[in-house]
Regions:
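N-terminal non-catalytic accessory region
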Residues: 24-200, 204-258, 363, 373-484, ...
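Extracellular Ig-like/FN3 beta-sandwich strand-entry sites
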Residues: 547-551
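Sec-dependent N-terminal signal peptides of Gram-positive bacterial secreted proteins and lipoproteins
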Residues: 4-22
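Alpha/beta-hydrolase fold catalytic core
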Residues: 161-168, 172-175, 289-371, 396
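Structural beta-strand segments of beta-rich domains
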Residues: 493-497
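Asparagine-centered strand-capping/turn motif at beta-strand->loop junctions
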Residues: 499-504
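Short strand-edge motifs at loop-to-beta-strand transitions and within beta-strands
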Residues: 534-540
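Alpha/beta-hydrolase-fold enzymes
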Residues: 250-320
Length: 634
């Protein structure tokens, strides 16, 4: 019964989330004359089986009316399955689901060697039929257009006639898809009459683009290439799924949803009170039953990160039956992937602008405890070295590569960008979720400037776009910075905290501010309304420690007129005010120490965590504690 209640609760929460509108990103400078090729995320293709598109069977590009029809046809069995599932029996419902999914995706099945069982075709592969202007004129839907929100904004600058939509047989490995991209770019050049293109890519498209640049970049067909949240080194979610070891992080999942819908209510702490572990059981029971249908897709194997690849092969593949698949994926993992830093650097040396935008600060939603954007680990997306999730490098940490004296350690000291594929051309955004680049004012504006102009050539080109940034998505509500300091840093001369309201619709009031490491007294007025997009300056008194290379956490508690009226956000700030802290080895916790931590004993802490109320109690206590100290009479 508890699991059934969880299902109902999660559905209600998801349905209650609302979308938020936002202003367009601002592109400054001369607009590029080259057409844009959009290389989308995973499975963004339409495949058919048969002699022609008109008479063939569509096997990807789902008809959701048909899906609903099948659900209704088996509604009784699904109802029984949910009933048994509520009592910890996932076999029945997953048998029902697998018996529908395997036939539905049968035509997509690959042999154990990675070749397609059926001869499938793409709808169109030429530039004319993939051109936005053509599609808008000849189709009433957006099925064949990729990343529609993004392309609509790009069209404001270059017109739909200069936007082209790439697609591939996404089941195949990155090397195969990169070959298709090369052929498509030749078609775009011929159709547009231009000698180069600009590339915008996302997720799997980022892996394909990086592979294309490694294998075909020598041709010089690209001017700007922007890879957002790219799966260059793989996707953590693929390993968790194929190995049936999903352990959903419910809080991260709900924050992902909040981020995507840009909701201004903070629902995720409710999920802490009622974990949704039933999803883990469902998926881990289902995946082995559908593995014969999707488990031999080369793209899924290229998604396995190199540190887990051999274990996955040994567990799931027969070395003889899957020899062909293994050969192709081995080549990606052990030849192409290691060459990408050198090949991308060569592209830059030859005049191309290559850039990566990646998210940090979240676990993988399916359970992998690594720093990520919720889907792809930061290390896989960028090549950076990351501390274990929930920890940071110890005080006095020294970056691995010197990078000509450039500082490559993140403000929270959990990311070392000196080992990145492109140390000077990669932007890291703490709190950015996968696929949400367009839904963050900072990343949206950055990606359009990188794509459509030649103004930004590296992370030092424009101080408005620092290499490390905290997300400004509306769901975060507030964003803090120290006046006169670089993003994420605090120096000795600082005397003012600037807090911005990142929400789009809600007025915010600052209820309290807590700092660990820094002993600061803020002149805070809790009755000042901060309008959406506006900021206030909060003076403070206190000394910044005369040290560098350590982190102070600043937690801003806020109040707003929403269903969840109180919330908070914690940001880590690197202190840069003197000699480096004495070097220590290993890692330390990244979690802030708050007043509540100092008064709650271990037994009470366990009880509150068990019932999911610790965060709520902590917020209320810390706000009261702040004002008790601020108003105390000596």
């Amino acid at each position: 019964m508890k699991k059934l209640l969880c299902i109902i609760m999660s559905a209600v929460m998801l349905l209650s989330l609302s979308c938020t509108a936002f202003a367009a990103g601002e592109v400054k400078g001369d607009i590029s004359e080259y057409p844009v090729v959009i290389v989308p995320g995973y499975s963004s293709s339409n495949l058919y089986y048969g002699d022609s598109l008109e008479t063939g069977e569509t096997v990807w590009g789902l008809n959701f009316d048909y899906v609903i029809e099948r659900v209704l046809a088996r509604i009784a069995e699904l109802g029984i399955g949910l009933g048994t599932f509520a009592f910890d029996d996932a076999e029945y419902i997953t048998d029902v689901l697998a018996s529908e999914m395997n036939p539905l995706f049968e035509k997509l099945r690959c042999n154990p060697d990675g070749t397609s069982v059926y001869e499938l075709h793409q709808d169109y592969t030429d530039a004319l039929h993939k051109n936005n202007a053509y599609l808008i004129e000849n189709r009433t839907d957006t099925m064949y257009r990729q990343e529609v929100e993004i392309s609509e904004e790009i069209a404001q600058y270059i017109g739909h006639e200069n936007i082209y939509n790439f697609s591939s047989d996404f089941r195949m490995g990155a090397e195969s898809c990169a070959g298709e991209l090369d052929a498509f770019i030749q078609s775009v050049k011929e159709h547009s009459g231009k000698d180069k293109v600009n590339i915008f890519s996302l997720s799997h498209g980022g892996q394909v683009t990086a592979t294309y640049l490694a294998l075909y970049g020598y041709k010089g067909d690209v001017d700007n290439a922007v890879m957002t949240v790219p799966a260059i080194g793989g996707a953590g979610i693929a390993y968790d799924a194929l190995m049936a070891c999903v352990e959903f992080d419910e809080e991260c999942l709900l924050r992902f949803v909040e981020n995507g819908t840009m909701t201004e209510e903070n629902y995720n702490w409710f999920v802490k009170a009622q974990p949704l572990g039933f999803v883990d059981t469902l998926l881990n029971t289902l995946f082995p039953k559908i593995f014969p249908t999707i488990g031999y897709w080369g793209s899924l194997w290229d998604f396995i990160t190199v540190d887990k690849y051999e274990h996955a092969k040994e567990t799931l593949l027969d070395s003889e039956e899957s020899a062909g698949l293994i050969e192709i994926s081995d080549r990606y993992h052990y030849e192409i992937l290691p060459s990408i830093p050198e090949k991308l650097a060569e592209c830059i040396d030859n005049g191309m602008n290559i850039s990566i935008i990646a998210g940090t600060g979240n676990v993988v939603v399916t359970g992998m405890q690594e720093n990520s954007d919720g889907i792809i680990t930061t290390a896989a997306a960028t090549g950076a070295t990351c501390a274990p999730f929930g920890q940071r490098f110890a005080d006095g940490y020294e970056q691995i590569n010197p990078c000509n004296g450039k500082d490559k350690v993140s403000p929270a000291m959990d990311v070392d960008a000196s080992t990145a594929y492109l140390p000077d051309n990669t932007w890291f955004v703490d709190g950015l979720f996968h696929g949400m680049t367009y839904k963050d004012n900072y990343t949206r504006t950055l990606m359009f400037n990188l794509l459509l102009t030649d103004n930004i050539t590296d992370v030092y080109s424009d101080p408005a776009y620092p290499q490390f940034k905290y997300s400004t998505n509306a769901s975060h509500t507030v964003h803090a910075s120290f006046k006169g300091c670089d993003e994420g840093f605090v120096t000795g001369g600082a005397d003012t905290l600037v807090v911005m309201n990142t929400s789009a619709n809600s007025t915010v009031r600052i209820a309290a501010i807590d700092c660990d490491v820094l002993d600061l007294d803020f002149a805070l007025n809790p009755f000042i309304d901060i309008a959406p997009g506006e900021s206030i300056e909060i003076p403070f008194k206190g000394e910044i420690p005369a040290v560098s290379g350590t982190v102070a956490n600043v937690t801003v508690y806020y109040a707003m007129d929403t269903v969840t009226p109180v919330g908070y956000r914690t940001q880590g700030f690197r202190i840069d005010n003197g000699e480096s802290a004495e070097k220590q080895d290993g890692f330390v916790s990244i979690e802030p120490t708050t007043p509540f931590d100092g008064v709650v004993d271990n037994n009470l802490n366990v009880i509150l965590k068990t019932f999911g109320f610790r965060e709520m109690f902590s917020m209320i206590f810390n706000i009261i504690y702040y004002w008790f100290n601020a108003l105390r009479i000596f």
